Design a protein with these regions (language model features):
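Hydrophobic (often cysteine-bearing) scaffold residues that line and stabilize catalytic clefts
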Residues: 26, 77, 99, 103
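N-terminal low-structure segments adjacent to metalloprotease catalytic domains
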Residues: 1-17, 88, 108, 112
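Auxiliary, metal-adjacent structural segments of Zn-dependent hydrolase domains
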Residues: 6-67, 71-73, 119-126
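Short pre-active-site segment immediately N-terminal to the catalytic Zn-binding motif
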Residues: 64-80, 93-98
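Post-HExxH zinc-binding segment in Zn-dependent metallohydrolases
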Residues: 96-126
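Active-site His/Glu-centered metal-binding helix of metallohydrolases
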Residues: 80-89, 102
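Aromatic side chains
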Residues: 59, 84-85, 106, 110
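Metal-dependent phosphohydrolase cores
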Residues: 34-36, 79, 84, 115
Length: 126
C-alpha cells in the first residue's frame, strides 16, 4: 500500500469509477469523472454513427456524445473510459485530436487499479 495519500485517493477514485461501470452505472461514473476533471458530462447513446458503423464505440465532439455500437459495452470499463478520454481531450483542448494510444493508456490505468484492488480483496478472503 502506498504511503502517499494523493496516490491512495486517486487509486480509490479509479476503483470506484470502474466498479460503477461494471455495475451498469456508466452515467454515474461519467458524472464523477466529469466533476473530477472539471468538464461537462458527455451524453451516452447506444447506436452507430455514419462513417463509424464498424467501430465498437466512438465519441462525436460536436454532440459531446459517446456512441456505443452495442448495449453490452455499457458495462465495459475499457471501452467507456477510452471514449471518455476522447471527450476529456476534446473538452480540454477544443480540438478533435483523437489519440488512440493515450486513450488506451487512460483506460488501462483505471482497469489496473481496479484489478489490483480486486486481487487484494480476494487475497484477504482466503
Amino acid at each position: 500500500m502506498s504511503s502517499n495519500p494523493r496516490h491512495d485517493s486517486m487509486h480509490e477514485f479509479r476503483v470506484e469509477v470502474v466498479r460503477l461501470m461494471l455495475d451498469g452505472k456508466a452515467e454515474v461514473a461519467f458524472g464523477l469523472l466529469s466533476k473530477h476533471y472539471g468538464i461537462r458530462e458527455p451524453a451516452l447513446r447506444v447506436g452507430t454513427v455514419k462513417r463509424h458503423r464498424k467501430v465498437l464505440a466512438c465519441y462525436v465532439e460536436k454532440e459531446r456524445r459517446i456512441y456505443l455500437s452495442n448495449s453490452s459495452f455499457l458495462t465495459n470499463p475499457f471501452v467507456l473510459l477510452h471514449e471518455f478520454y476522447h471527450h476529456l481531450r476534446a473538452s480540454a483542448v477544443g480540438k478533435s485530436r483523437q489519440v488512440e494510444k493515450r486513450a488506451d493508456q487512460f483506460a488501462e490505468v483505471f482497469i489496473r487499479d481496479f484489478l489490483s484492488w480486486r486481487s487484494a480483496i480476494v487475497g484477504r478472503k482466503r
